[in-house]
Amino acid sequence: MRVVNRTAVTITGAQPFVDWMRDTDADFNRGAITVPRAKAYGSAFLLPEFDLEEDLQEWVEDNVAWLFDFQLSAWTENEETWPENRDLATFREWFRIDIHSVVVDVADDDIEGEEL
């Protein structure tokens, strides 16, 4: 077990995102997805450690287009269903951002990943 020198940011869907999920998939239009259940469809990002929360907020602002597209593509890659307006204000309406300053890796094996 080790503390990792990263800041974790989790992004989960708020009501507008859940409504969009339902609209794009009829199987979920029956109430299977709610805001609390949408948490399972969230994402976690490991960022460099930031001394100030303002620096982290600036990172989100600088990367909002990529973050928004990433969240949408995790649900469907059909960009025709994506909202046209994907700016910072809309992102903040559609998603909840949680910051975790302490990240602990409890696994014994090395972290593996693929480049995006």
Could you describe each region identified by the protein language model?
Residues 46-113:
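Amphipathic protein-protein interaction modules
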